[in-house]
From Swiss-Prot:
InterPro entries: CMC4, Cys_alpha_HP_mot_SF. Disulfide bonds join 5-36, 15-26. Residues 2-44 form the CHCH domain. The keyword Transport does not apply. SUPFAM superfamilies: Cysteine alpha-hairpin motif (SSF47072). This is Cx9C motif-containing protein 4, mitochondrial.
Amino acid sequence: MTDPCKPQACAIQGCLTKTGFDESKCSHLIDSLYECCSKFYNERGADARTPCCPVPSLLRLKLEQRACGPLDAKRVR
């Protein structure tokens, strides 16, 4: 099985590398991954697994947290 969310996960890794691991600058890509993962579980069910997505219960928690405001770590200089 190919991982449908691998491009989003790889984009996060590239962004983190490019920005010196400043997670706050990659927030839009993290959101994109979580959207992809939500679609993945909606289409394939909660028992589906992929290495690029958190398990459904953790994904729900992450989405709830992100809905409350910015949570990404900012790099301390």
